[in-house]
């Protein structure tokens, strides 16, 4: 009987995970950009990687928010809400550990982010770094030091500007169509913070209540990249693409650029499937979830 109960619990957990897994229809639509991404999961819908697509006009009632802010003379908030119609957000996370229950942290992050985003849009007209300070602090207080989440959240505008915060996550890559290679962005002084839940936030109003022998995390700052040229590709990914077989196989370093040279003329979805096929040929049977999101400038 215990085994049957365990199987039923796993099935129930699969159902919960499926409800927060992004539908293909949620992929943002931004004028001048072609966006596509998927997770290659080891355990079906239950996964240590997670994507939240934020097409602001689909996720939130921007027009009603704009109307309400204009009625109360919140002109700055109204203007920021209008700007959201020309951009979309993407959150990509990766939970430490490979057990089924580890993915519960992604479900917690999913709900915390969307609830917080709704509040911030209504009050500030934008998603601010303060939301992630609060999320980080709550995760620190409710999970152990070995249970954390790497995360990147960014917003892409129709002109190709990508502004993002990274918490222990692999930094984005840019493939240049003109130079036919992944360009070096190391000289841009991009900032990568500790993973979500590893250190309390020194700037969060409640952060000092959290005791930490390792100290406190500095306030999040926002990085900026620009996908300038026609055909350029911005690449977001989890470490499943760079660390397979206990870190012995790195697809990003060894194969990704060559595959993009071959497939760069295709739409983002077809490029992704070419990369996926090459990745599976490269590593055989993956031992970690792997996620990649491609943003191609038309």
Where are the regions a protein language model picked out?
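Conserved subregion of the PPM/PP2C metallophosphatase catalytic domain
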Residues: 1-33, 38-91, 96-99, 110-298
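Catalytic Zn2+-binding segment of zinc metalloproteases
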Residues: 100, 104
């Amino acid at each position: 009987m215990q085994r049957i109960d365990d199987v039923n619990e796993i099935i129930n957990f699969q159902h919960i995970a499926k409800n927060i897994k992004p539908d293909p229809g949620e992929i943002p639509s931004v004028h001048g950009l072609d966006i596509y991404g998927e997770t290659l999961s080891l355990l079906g819908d239950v996964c240590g990687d997670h994507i939240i697509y934020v097409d602001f006009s689909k996720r939130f009632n921007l027009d009603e928010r704009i109307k309400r802010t204009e009625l109360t003379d919140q002109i700055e908030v109204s203007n920021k809400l209008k700007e959201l119609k020309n951009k979309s957000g993407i959150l990509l996370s990766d939970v430490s550990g490979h057990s089924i229950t580890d993915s519960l942290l992604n479900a917690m992050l999913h709900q915390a982010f969307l609830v917080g985003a709704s509040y911030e849009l209504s009050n500030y007209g934008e998603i601010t770094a303060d939301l992630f300070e609060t999320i980080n602090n709550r995760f620190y207080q409710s999970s152990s030091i070995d249970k954390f989440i790497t995360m990147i959240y960014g917003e892409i505008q129709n002109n190709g500007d990508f502004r993002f915060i990274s918490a222990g996550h692999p930094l984005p890559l840019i493939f240049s169509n003109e130079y036919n290679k992944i360009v070096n962005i190391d000289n841009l002084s991009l900032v990568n913070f500790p993973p979500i839940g590893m250190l309390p936030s020194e700037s969060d109003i409640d952060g000092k209540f959290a005791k930490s022998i390792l100290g406190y995390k500095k306030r999040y700052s926002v990085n900026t990249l620009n996908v300038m040229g026609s055909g350029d590709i911005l690449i977001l990914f989890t470490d499943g693409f760079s660390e397979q077989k206990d870190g012995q196989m790195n697809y990003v370093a060894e194969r990704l650029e060559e595959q993009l040279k071959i497939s760069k003329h295709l739409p983002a979805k077809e490029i992704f499937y070419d990369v996926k096929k090459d990745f599976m040929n490269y590593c055989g049977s993956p031992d970690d979830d792997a996620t990649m999101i491609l943003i191609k400038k038309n």
